[in-house]
Amino acid sequence: MDSSARTTQFLTRKIDVMSVYLSNEWPQIEKRANVKFNILRVSDFGLNLLGASIIVGNAFAEQSPETVRKLLRATAKGYRDAIADPKAAAKTMAKYMRVPEDPEVLDRQVEATVLSTNAPPGKPIGWQEAADWQANLTLLKETGGLPEIKPLNAYYTNDYLQ
C-alpha cells in the first residue's frame, strides 16, 4: 500500500498501526490529525534500522573516489550544521522546496532527521555498523523481502568516509 493510502487508512481509523518515517511522515501526520501519536521505535526493541543513505554505483565510486568523498563530507557538514541549529537548517531548506511545507512541520522534520544519524560514538556521520546491516538483512530474509544474503561488502562500505 502506498504511503498516502496507508495514511488515509490510519487517519480514518480503518487500521490501528502503521509504519512511518519519523523524519518526514510523522510530523506531517500529527499536524494533519492535530494529535500527538504514540510512537514505537523499532530501535527500542533492538533493531537499528539503517537511515538515510547515499547510493553510488560501484563503477562511479571506483572511477571518482574523491568525488564520493567530497559528497559525503558535504553531507556530513550539512548534518552537523543542522544539528547545531535545526531552525536555521529548516529555513534554508524551505527556500529550495518546490512544494512549501508548513514551517512547524519542517522544523520537526529537521529535528527528527538529525536525531536519526545513528553514527556510533567516535565515527563520522554516515558510518554504518556491520551488525546493524546484518540484523536488517536477516530481518528482510526472514520476512521474505530478500531471497539471499550476500556478503556485507555487496551492500555498503565505510571506506569513503575515511
Over which residues does each language-model region extend?
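Short loop/turn and capping residues at structural boundaries
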Residues: 21, 41, 105, 151-152
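Pocket-lining segment of extracytoplasmic ligand-binding domains
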Residues: 5-9, 13-99
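Short secondary-structure boundary/hinge segments and terminal tails
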Residues: 28, 47-48, 111-112, 157-159
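Secondary-structure end/capping motifs
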Residues: 62-143
